[in-house]
Amino acid sequence: MLMKINEGKNYVELTVERVEDLFILYLILKPGDLVYSWTVREVRGRSGERFGREKVYLGVRVRDLEFHEPRGVLRIRGIIEDYPEWLEGAGGSYHSLEVGIGSTLKIMRSINRDYLEQLINTLSSGIKVLIVSVSIEETTVALATRLGVSIIATISNNYIQGKESGGSLINQRYIDDVSKVVRQLTEVHKPNALIIATQGMLMSSIPDIEVKGVPVERVIVSEGGLSGIYEVERRGYLDKVGLKLGYDTVNRIMEELSKGSGLVALGDEIYEALSMGAVDSLVMLDKLLIEKAEESRRIIDDCIRTRAKLIIVPDGSEAGKLLNGLGGLAALLRFRIK
């Protein structure tokens, strides 16, 4: 469980530890909720003179929410209801709480524990994988997390001079450059695993990039560089290290659709299938959690009730591209409903 949770009789207090936790807060919070958090607010005197910005603990009645994924911030806008006595005139004023990694938020109502744990289990895989895809011309490095696969570095080969003496196809100085960057990125991102991907003819030319405490898996792909990153995802190597981004399930959905088996539900059929307990696995694009939050809450509730497996698929992933073509939501069924 990535969130630190303290439960009281009529409140739940949560500390955000990863960006994924902000998705969870976005789904939990509703307009009308009273929330408390530390924030910064400008202090003014009775005659309007400014005394600067001060850190203060405020209770804010939620009006609306705005999620900024690139910044890793959830902005909660609302009306100040509870504030320290020295902050004169704050009551009834608008204020925005910016909740990010490390922030603690107290929500003044009880929250269904099963619903909360389902969200955490679904959205908050803490696994991070560094993928290093090597070709003769360049190396592409990507970070794979629960939110998808992001390209974080490209290293060009500035030493291409034909085949190296001794039979090597890759210049050692190029490999040294790659190793240096990978070690630096490992220090920054602290991945759980490292995947080195390249063509079979190059694999013997690439020595192990040893990073203390990080297991390394070497895989052969048809092409290195950026294409190799996507091939690693498509071929299920991320699943093998525990990071499931939904490709296998989406691929099976496409196969069942092509067969006309009747074991796939799309659109409004999904709600009918959920109400009948017919859904085995449901895949949803992550962007729907933000764009259609209320609908997402209903779907998650139904998955919990019927014990359907829920998989959130990153929009920019290979599986996400396929799922986009199906409307962003699809379900594999336990049995036909028509």
Swiss-Prot record:
InterPro entries hit by this protein: eFR1_2_sf, eRF1_1_Pelota, eRF1_3, Pelota/DOM34_N, Pelota_arc, Ribosomal_eL30-like_sf, Transl-rel_pelota
Coiled coil: none
GO biological process, one term: nuclear-transcribed mRNA catabolic process, non-stop decay
MF term (GO), any: endonuclease activity
Nuclease in keyword set: yes
GO cellular component, one term: cytoplasm
Disulphides: none
Domain of life: Archaea
Family: Belongs to the eukaryotic release factor 1 family. Pelota subfamily.
Protein name from the UniProt record: Protein pelota homolog
Record's keyword annotation contains Cytoplasm: yes
Assembly notes: Monomer.
Protein role: May function in recognizing stalled ribosomes, interact with stem-loop structures in stalled mRNA molecules, and effect endonucleolytic cleavage of the mRNA. May play a role in the release non-functional ribosomes and degradation of damaged mRNAs. Has endoribonuclease activity.
Main location: cytoplasm
Organism in which the protein naturally occurs: Caldivirga maquilingensis (strain ATCC 700844 / DSM 13496 / JCM 10307 / IC-167)
Domains as described in the record: The N-terminal domain has the RNA-binding Sm fold. It harbors the endoribonuclease activity.
